[in-house]
Amino acid sequence: MNGNLDKKNGFLYAKAAVAALCGAFTAAFGWLGWLVLAWAACMALDWLSGSAAAASRGEWSSAAARAGIWHKAGMVVVVCVAALTDLVLNVAVENLPAFGDGVGFDFEGVVLPVVLVWYIFTELGSIAENAAAMGAPVPGWLVRILAQGKEGAEK
């Protein structure tokens, strides 16, 4: 009986710790932090699933894996550019004399979230393609939703 209670308490402590970490992360980084985390997870899963798909076909090579990592590094650069673009736009909106005392609203940024969403949909589409290359059936409607999400972010 006591062992069961300890297992339940351990599970409750683990749930409380996860909830506390998620709350602290949200307090520190807000919804944008979760978007960045989702993008990073998608990048990692895409690289892993791409490597697995290549290995399943007997086509894995360290050169191709390195090229994939460089591709991901380029994406990080683009996300940094988007973040800096939002920062510059925010400073301009709040401080340029042409706007007087600003434009009367807070500019929290739109470039970075749109770039992140576009990359997330791109990565998810690639992950689905990798899964199909490994032999997993991928519903056509899922592929269409991912394509529409990417197109929507491009507009």
How should these model regions be labeled?
Residues 91-124:
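Hydrophobic alpha-helical transmembrane segments and immediately flanking/interface helices
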Residues 1-14, 101-104, 121-155:
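Membrane-proximal cytosolic segments adjacent to transmembrane helices
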Residues 39-49, 75-86, 115-126:
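Alpha-helical transmembrane segments of multi-pass membrane proteins
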